[in-house]
UniProtKB/Swiss-Prot annotation:
Keywords: Ribonucleoprotein, Ribosomal protein. GO terms for biological process: translation. The gene is rpmJ. The keyword Heme does not apply. GO terms for cellular component: cytoplasm; ribonucleoprotein complex; ribosome. GO terms for molecular function: structural constituent of ribosome. InterPro entries: Ribosomal_bL36, Ribosomal_bL36_sp. PANTHER family: 50S RIBOSOMAL PROTEIN L36, CHLOROPLASTIC, LARGE RIBOSOMAL SUBUNIT PROTEIN BL36C. The keyword Ribosomal protein applies. This is Large ribosomal subunit protein bL36. It comes from the Bacteria.
Length: 38
């Protein structure tokens, strides 16, 4: 899980999800693409 100020989708399987006011990126193909804004 990377914590970044600006989250971007890194591949076509990445999805931007907002949970409890926190913007996250989840990816089904590569778990290294997981990100959280913070």
């Amino acid at each position: 899980m990377k914590v970044r100020t600006s989250v971007k989708t890194l591949c076509r399987n990445c999805k931007i999800v907002k949970r409890h006011g926190i913007i996250r990126v989840i990816c089904s193909s590569d778990p290294k693409h997981k990100q959280r804004q913070g």
